[in-house]
UniProtKB/Swiss-Prot annotation:
Catalytic activity: GTP + H2O = GDP + phosphate + H(+)
GO molecular function annotation: GTP binding; GTPase activity; guanosine tetraphosphate binding; translation elongation factor activity
Name of encoding gene: tuf1
Region G3, residue ranges: 81-84
Lineage start: Bacteria, Pseudomonadati, Pseudomonadota, Gammaproteobacteria, Aeromonadales
UniProt-recorded name of the protein: Elongation factor Tu
Function: GTP hydrolase that promotes the GTP-dependent binding of aminoacyl-tRNA to the A-site of ribosomes during protein biosynthesis.
Residue sites binding GTP per the record: 19-26, 81-85, 136-139
Organism, as annotated: Aeromonas salmonicida (strain A449)
Length: 394
């Protein structure tokens, strides 16, 4: 393959395979890379290259993840695949691999299984916006009615968790046959790729979203005023614009009178940049780490939310013992810890290290948050859990 085929100017989209163990997620991942490499160039990955997933650490949690990439005519995709169920749980909750859309793999020979359901639920909780279904192993099912039945079951399950089950794309294929080079089944991989291109919208870039910067530090500069520093998470702030300081205390409105980076003055600060923002009429003691600087009205402070949490195992450096209702750890958001209490789901008395659990958290001070915000749970500075805000309550 000639080298110059690979262009970085295509839109970039993050996807991944999810679904029950042994339903063919890794085989499908290999098949996609092989079939698309034939058609559009790029690297083909073999099954065992993907299956030997390297260990990564995200917020102190050990996760095995394989990353592959592939191209279609119009897009470049980064694709994650995990070997084990626990890796999926951790990956989705920590946001180690943010997905703009997921390919749910369901074996036609089995239909939906317990982890199929759990991955759909997790996808809903952590805010994966789009699902495409790949019904795998269809070469092993001769009965058309059985295929219809499995498809119906999967669609109903997705609808149950608020995905548009009736409308989302379902592809019937055989990852193994496609990987072996069977042209008819390769066609199904192309069909899947077409759905990726058309069903998952191009993700909004961080720079196009409303301005937000978590405040890391606050300085007072004689004769100039108060400067807050941090890395711009999203959007752009221009000199002269009104911004809000949100979280911990009452929301305050102020004007950004200067932006500097590496001691140079700029007209604006953009997503991804580490900046200092000079704020008009704000006292040093009125601002603190853990608040955010944001476009007015774009984000609100909250104290109560439903979350999905993964509790670190003892081996990962987490707790050695379970915790119970009334547990009061620190919740670390962006740049600071806030104490909070938890409510466990009905019928759940305790949570063991290594579990994942839905819990309602009430913080003692408000934090600027939206659904999808990630956090860590800490005890005395050591991380014992990772979570994501599934939905804000108050």
């Amino acid at each position: 393959m000639s080298k110059e085929k690979f262009e970085r100017n295509k839109p970039h989209v993050n996807v991944g395979t999810i679904g029950h163990v042994d339903h063919g997620k890794t085989t499908l991942t290999a098949a996609i890379t092989n079939v698309l490499a034939k058609h559009f160039g790029g690297k083909a990955f073999a099954f065992d290259q993907i299956d030997k997933a390297p260990e990564e650490r995200e917020r102190g949690i050990t996760i095995n993840t394989s990353h592959v990439e592939y191209d279609t005519a119009i897009r470049h995709y980064a694709h994650v695949d995990c070997p084990g169920h626990a890796d999926y749980v951790k990956n989705m909750i920590t946001g180690a691999a943010q997905m703009d859309g997921a390919i749910l793999v369901v074996a036609a020979t089995d239909g939906p299984m317990p982890q199929t359901r759990e991955h759909i639920l997790l996808g809903r909780q952590v805010g994966i916006p789009y699902m495409i279904v790949f019904m795998n192993k269809c070469d092993m099912v001769d009965d058309e009615e059985l295929l219809e039945l499995v498809e119906m079951e999967v669609r109903e399950l997705l609808t149950e968790y608020d995905f548009p089950g009736d409308d989302l794309p379902v592809v019937r294929g055989s990852a193994l046959k496609a990987l072996e080079g069977d042209a008819a089944w390769e066609e199904k991989i192309i069909e899947l790729a077409n759905h990726l291109d058309t069903y998952i919208p191009e993700p909004e870039r961080a720079i196009d979203l409303p301005f937000l910067m978590p405040i890391e530090d606050v300085f007072s500069i004689a004769g100039r005023g108060t400067v807050v520093t941090g890395r711009v998470e999203r959007g752009i702030v221009k000199v002269g614009e009104t911004v809000e300081i949100v979280g911990i205390k009452d929301t305050v409105s102020t004007t950004c009178t200067g932006v500097e980076m590496f001691r140079k003055l700029l007209d604006e600060g953009r997503a991804g940049e580490n900046i200092g923002a000079l704020l008009r009429g704000v006292k040093r003691e009125d601002v603190e780490r853990g608040q955010v600087l944001a476009k007015p009205g774009s984000i609100k402070p909250h104290t109560k939310f439903e979350s999905e949490v993964y509790v670190l195992s003892k081996e990962e450096g987490g707790r050695h013992t379970p915790f119970f209702k009334g547990y009061r750890p620190q919740f670390y958001f962006r740049t600071t810890d806030v104490t909070g209490t938890i409510e466990l789901p009905e019928g759940v008395e305790m949570v063991m290290p290594g579990d994942n659990i839905k819990m309602v958290v009430t913080l003692i001070a408000p934090i600027a948050m939206d659904d999808g915000l990630r956090f860590a749970i800490r005890e005395g500075g050591r991380t014992v859990g990772a979570g994501v805000v599934a939905s804000v309550i108050a």
